[in-house]
Amino acid sequence: MNNMKTFKFFTALFATAILTACTLDMERPTNVQYIDKTDAIWQQHLQKIQKIQSYQAKGQIGYISPTERFSSRFEWQYQNPKSYTLKLYSLISKSTLWIQMHQSGMTISDNNGNQQSAANSKLLLQEIIGMDVPLEHLAYWLKGQPAMNADYQVGTNHLLGAFTYHVDGSQWTADYLTYHSNNSMPENILLKNDSTKQTLKIRVDEWIY
């Protein structure tokens, strides 16, 4: 891409265009009851989602940080840690961003033909979009699979209720608010990082795996 300023200007317009009037509930739920992690139904479900290696998810995402605030439709396609795509788009403005992970790093592009690539995906996300979200971990968080070293809780629905996970010196928390009744996959997820003051609220409307 020849003009970084043009790309940044576009992403600013994109964020403005997809802002919605609804507000994100930034507070974690309270008085939630949990059950033991050895619960047989949960262990069976955990084995099921661990076998899901590649999948697609579609829905809506809302993001709040001290410098950015936007809401967007999204399409997530995941194959492996070195091959995934996150598409952010607006049904109103037709603005679209593609975030693509590949063997040599990450590429972010838009529907105007702007494109930027870098080997360091974390820095590229921060520079272009202003997000500091570990997408490599989001692949597991999205489907409700806690990391092996994560401190997590199981809800009374026998599914993942919440977890705490440390990434790059800061702590992320996740609360799984609702699940789809037909496949027991997450529907509404609240992700927060209090140290970086980031909130990510995700609603998954469709799962394909």
From Swiss-Prot:
Domain of life: Bacteria
Membrane-related topology note: Lipid-anchor
Lipidation (N-palmitoyl cysteine): C22
Keyword line: Cell outer membrane, Chaperone, Lipoprotein, Membrane, Palmitate, Protein transport, Signal, Transport
Gene3D superfamilies per the UniProt record, alphabetical: Lipoprotein localisation LolA/LolB/LppX (2.50.20.10)
InterPro entries: LolA/LolB/LppX, OM_lipoprot_LolB
Cellular component annotations (GO), alphabetically ordered: cell outer membrane
Compartments where located: Cell outer membrane
Reported function: Plays a critical role in the incorporation of lipoproteins in the outer membrane after they are released by the LolA protein.
Family: Belongs to the LolB family.
Assembly mode: Monomer.
Protein name, entry field: Outer-membrane lipoprotein LolB
